[in-house]
Each structure stands twice: as C-alpha cells, then as structure tokens.
Amino acid sequence: MATESVRVRDVLRIVGEVAAYRLRRLEMANMAGAAGIAVALHLPPADCAVRLCFAFGLNLLVYLNNDYLDLADDLLAPGRDDAKTRFLRDHRRAGLVAQLGLVVVLVVGAALVMPSLLLPLALGGGVCWAYSARLKAMPGADIAAMIAWGAAMPLVGSPPELALGWALVGWLGLFSGAFEGIQVIRDHDADAAAGVRTTAVALGVGRTLLLVRVMLAASAVYGALVVSPWLAALPAAAMLVPLDRSAPRPSGPGVDATRMWNRVRLLLGLAFLGALAWVWWTGSTHGVLVQVSRATVLG
C-alpha cells in the first residue's frame, strides 16, 4: 500500500474548510465571548487582538480534532457525507499534520507573546479531545465536559489572575451545559440508532429536558448571586421555553429541539451581552452575594 503524501495545499484546504463550515454554522461563539470579556475588562487593543487571534486558532484546532475523530460517524450521518468530509477521509495524514501544525503554532505563539494563554489551550484543547474521543458517549460526562469546555475556551479573553474573568466564564460554562443537554435531546434518535449512549439516550428525552431546566435554574441562581439579579431573569425565563414534541420530520412526528435551541440561545446571549456591558461600564459585577471588580486579583 502506497504511503499517502502530504501536500501543503491539502493541509491548508482542510483548515480553511473547517473554518468556513464552523463559522457558517455560528459554532465559534466562544470567540465572541472571549473578545467581549477582553473588551469588558478594558484590556489594551493590542492585547485584545492577540487574544482574538489565539481564540480563532484554538477553535480551528478543537473543531478540526472533533471532525477528525468523528470522521466515521460523519460519513454515515445524513447530510454530512459531503465533499469536505470525504476530502478529510481521503487525506487523513494531511488532517493529522494540520492538527499538529496548529498545536505548534499555538504553543510557540503563546510562549513567545503571552504565556498565560497556554492555560486555556491546555484546558480547552484537552477537554475537547477527551469529549470527542470518549466522553461524548458517557452519560453525564458529556454534559460535564461541555460545562468545563464552555468555561475554558472563552478564558482566552482574560488574564488568569483576574477574578472577574473567572466569574464571567463560570456563567458561560453553565450556559454551555444547558446547550449540550438540548443538543443531546436533538440528536437522541440518531445517537440511539448508532448505539451512542449519551445522557439523553440513557435518561430519555423527558428527564434530560428536566436536567436542562435544572441547569438553566443553576444559571439563574449563579447570575443573581454573582453577576446581576436583573440579568438572572433571562436564564430563568429560558426555563419556560418549550420543547416541540410534534414537529414534522422525514421519519414522522417526533422531537425537534431546534426552536428551543434558538430561543434559549437568544435569551442567554442577551444575558451575557448585558453582563459584558455592565462590567465594561461599571468595572464590576453586581450580584446580591458578591461583586467582583476588575481590580480583584486572585492569590
């Protein structure tokens, strides 16, 4: 069997297609979170630019790794056996080289310019790899991993010694857990058919939906205690968003989580934008339990 050669243009094509596909699907929202946190913390413009570039590179790495590890499943999934997926299948070594290249660029770049970025690289990249390789098929661990990932990725936007950055990404982590719950509800039928044991497959749609509402309640409580009781009303309102259980589908009536996903995303997005605006304007959160300011340094 001939050894597959690796061409630079194949590597660049794979990276470019990952970027285009994920940006088109609005799946790099953590970049906006990182950029918003950096601006809210009043970091210098050059600092913000470095962090945004790093966030983009980190997103390329984790999503390419996800596509690489999910390749076999994607080829069988409806609508995913496209030219992009087939190209990655036919150029696996180029996909591996692309990942290694991104790791080198991110590690060297962070070490030379901003060593503190190695922390979100290790946390975000490590959690995403573990999720794609194993945790996504472990009930409970799939949602826990996305809570950790949802906090780790936007941590790019904050120096790790600033308590305010941690307070904000903690809220995003809870949001991410709720979104993962909705996602596994959406994918319940396909995962069950493929033998993938997610939280929704293990618990069923009804109990997973209850878990999503519990996580939204936790987000509301966290928001009231740490961020703002007024903004906490938005994740509380998200608890009331219904799940469409009778949507028409090719296989007949069933559960369609798309509408719920979009409505919850709108409410939680507005909550976080409000938090960023408040922090940018006042320099502090305004929770009923704690107020974390830009001047608060850990340790």
What are these model-predicted stretches?
Residues 55-82, 176-199:
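Acidic (Asp/Glu-rich) catalytic motifs at the cytosolic membrane interface
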Residues 29-37, 143-160, 200-205, 259-279:
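Small-residue-rich segments of transmembrane alpha-helices in multi-pass membrane proteins
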Residues 38-46, 143-192, 206-219:
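Functional transmembrane core segments of multi-pass inner-membrane proteins
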Residues 32-68, 117-129, 164-182:
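Membrane-embedded alpha-helical segments that form the functional core of polytopic membrane enzymes
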Residues 63, 67-68, 72, 126-139, ...:
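C-terminal ends of transmembrane helices
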Residues 71-116, 196-228:
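Multi-pass membrane catalytic core of lipid/isoprenoid biosynthesis enzymes
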Residues 12, 225, 230-299:
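Extended hydrophobic alpha-helices typical of membrane-associated regions
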Residues 10-13, 83-164, 244-246:
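Intramembrane alpha-helical segments
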